[in-house]
Curated annotation (Swiss-Prot):
Lineage: Bacteria, Bacillati, Bacillota, Bacilli, Lactobacillales
Sites where the protein binds GTP: D23, H24, G25, K26, S27, T28, N140, K141, I142, D143
Family of the protein in this entry: Belongs to the TRAFAC class translation factor GTPase superfamily. Classic translation factor GTPase family. LepA subfamily.
Gene Ontology molecular function, alphabetical: GTP binding; GTPase activity; ribosome binding; translation elongation factor activity
Protein name: Elongation factor 4
EC annotation from Swiss-Prot or TrEMBL: 3.6.5.n1
Record's bilayer topology term: Peripheral membrane protein
Reactions catalysed: GTP + H2O = GDP + phosphate + H(+)
Location within or outside the cell: Cell membrane
Primary localization class, coarse: membrane
Entry's Gene Ontology BP terms: positive regulation of translation
Amino acid sequence: MNSQELKKRQENIRNFSIIAHIDHGKSTLADRILEKTETVSSREMQAQLLDSMDLERERGITIKLNAIELNYKAKNGQDYIFHLIDTPGHVDFTYEVSRSLAACEGAVLVVDAAQGIEAQTLANVYLALDNDLEILPVINKIDLPAADPERVRQEIEDVIGLDASEAVLASAKSGIGIEAILEQIVEKVPAPSGDVDKPLQALIFDSVYDAYRGVILQVRVVNGMVKPGDTIQMMSNGKTFDVTEVGIFTPKAIGRDFLATGDVGYIAASIKTVADTRVGDTVTLATNPAAEPLHGYKQMNPMVFAGIYPIESNKYNDLREALEKLQLNDASLQFEPETSQALGFGFRCGFLGLLHMDVIQERLEREFNIDLIMTAPSVVYHVNTTDGDMLEVSNPSEFPDPTKVDSIEEPYVKAQIMVPQEFVGAVMELAQRKRGDFVTMDYIDDNRVNVIYHIPLAEIVFDFFDKLKSSTRGYASFDYEIAEYRRSQLVKMDILLNGDKVDALSFIVHREFAYERGKLIVEKLKKIIPRQQFEVPIQAAIGQKIVARSDIKALRKNVLAKCYGGDVSRKRKLLEKQKAGKKRMKAIGSVEVPQEAFLSVLSMDDESKK
């Protein structure tokens, strides 16, 4: 194709993504669009086709973004090339959403006709507006008995400020309104800007590792074109590679002769090491490089940290390789090696949130077959020492000596909770119990309220979301963003078994709750840790001060069984001998801590509040 033909082709390209709150029908709508454009045959069609991970299909959530090319013949008789970039809706995967939106010109905003706008709908709309995307509202699930499209239309106008007069009324499940959505994409989403004659600039928005072909880059070509045989260069580190194959996904990978401006596809270039590529980097040609890289993504900082250890210590290297491969297409995962006296060698990993942590743990166990122990999640604290230094601490065992600590600051989040009016009381009670500060409350319509609180992230990390869902019968929707660091009265609590600290059980707690937390955990461990041949004291300590204690009684043989009657001094001699033996044992004995003990520290919160 000459450059004139390529420019003509570019005018008929439409890049768009679908954004929605969880369960508003995003993946189903994507399925219908694939069917309507006959991208997949009816034989290959299965529900949630784009959610290719088992984990995604089981949980019914989208975790990874996917990019697919579709061909559509519009009513005006022209053929269009659509690139549908599927996005996750969950708050932990906002980063994935921002990456996919950077590769689009338009977004289809799906809102449930019965539920209306939810917290994450708003969060994703703001991301789309930040990227200057054309937003097309779609009111989905209009065939539900509880659907009220007119109320939702009004809500979209009032809450988001979008003109919803032309919003498509659709039902992805029944296939109603799909054609109207496709026509709106043709009319309203702008064609990609960019110039095919300029030097190549392609944005890497994802990458996957293939055992045979190395790292495969998923890119959006912004300027120029790339074809097999070209030598590409990464703009962040200057490394060069020879392109062996370019192509598109329809969900299956299909090779092409070239990728030109506006295209979304993949590049394979025998990139062997995972570290050579980074999501958000710009690819250019080594022979005719671009002057400057594209505006990439903002780097996401992990919010939640936890230790991951292999149960079998010889799997340590396997775990490292597995984490490197996961990091390749999950740029927000961070990890570094750490050791623990109780658990051996492992990694300290940083995650965006609890669902992210959960998903990574399941992927490690499923895809790489490694059994893991996870320690309790913690957040990044700022510790100001008496020497005037500020330390960032994410691992309780790295906390400095309490005598050297001047003050501790912890991260607070701005939590936005949308909830029906009848549950406002329950939500406020929960937020206060979690040390939240009330900020404001707005009525969205007659029945739904948007409540905003500042809450410490450490309280959200535990089980805030589960508690919120149960106290509002699942009606609340929740979104949070980091607001600021604030000074708090925090202390580090150590757990001692038989007088020895178990580093993996240490945690940070607010001074107010320290005593009851300590007491609870000690009682819980007493039930879980098996009885030994000697008595084992379990203690909770803050610095040198013991705040709670419980003893696991020793297993002992009845040494008096053979003394029928007999002299009391004979019995005493046998008991004293047993006691001396137990004492000697206790001095040299060590206590095995079962996996449940670490988990009990996690699920602590639920009982302390009953």
